Amino acid sequence: MKTKILSLANEEVGEISLNEDIFAVEFIRDDIIKQVIDWQRAKAMSGNHKTKTVSEVLGTTKKPFKQKGTGNARQGSLRSVQMRGGGVAHGPRVRSHATKLPKKVRKLGLIHALSEKCAEGKLLVIDSLKLDKPKTSALVNILNKFQGKSFFVIDGNEVDINFSLAAKNIYNTVIVPQIGANVYDIIRHEYVLLSQEAVSVLEERLR
């Protein structure tokens, strides 16, 4: 499958052949894409939520009042779960939310996400993702030429430092090396910009 190579000025400068097994899968598997996104989001969760149990709450262990004769229900401790300021029964604990997902499925998810963007016409190949100076205003003007609201930019094995610094303060714009290409960011951004180097490295990686 052939597609245009664009410059950062959004002008056609050539043509590139894309591997159809990676960028033009015939049937897009949304279920696989969702599986991978769920796996990514679960892995990213901090899991540091926690409540205190009866044994962890600070307070006395003294019986609040005598067993009989008060007319109240019997109580053994002010730290019990039914008492105000007491512990929490079956509350959240610190844990990892990460789940396991086979590499084969993760790879398929990336392929189908790239194919989906390509089918929408929102995957663009750029000849070079390099800037002379790390100027945010200059990069904003460049991205405005593509008329998109959000951009996921994938470079080769290394990201141009000037491009990276310029993109830091731009809302909904993320730049990563090819190893950082992931399904969640591809789907949640409107446009995916790939450098020529990124295309060749991704095709080699996902073959």
Curated annotation (Swiss-Prot):
Species of provenance: Rickettsia conorii (strain ATCC VR-613 / Malish 7)
InterPro entries: Ribosomal_uL4, Ribosomal_uL4-like, Ribosomal_uL4_dom_sf
Domain of life per record: Bacteria
Entry-linked SUPFAM superfamilies: Ribosomal protein L4
GO molecular function: rRNA binding; structural constituent of ribosome
Pfam (any one): Ribosomal_L4
Key words of the record: Ribonucleoprotein, Ribosomal protein, RNA-binding, rRNA-binding
Coiled-coil residues: none
Name this polypeptide is given: Large ribosomal subunit protein uL4
Family according to the record: Belongs to the universal ribosomal protein uL4 family.
Statement: the UniProt record of this protein carries the keyword Ribonucleoprotein: yes
Function: One of the primary rRNA binding proteins, this protein initially binds near the 5'-end of the 23S rRNA. It is important during the early stages of 50S assembly. It makes multiple contacts with different domains of the 23S rRNA in the assembled 50S subunit and ribosome.
Subunit structure: Part of the 50S ribosomal subunit.
Record has rRNA-binding as a keyword: yes
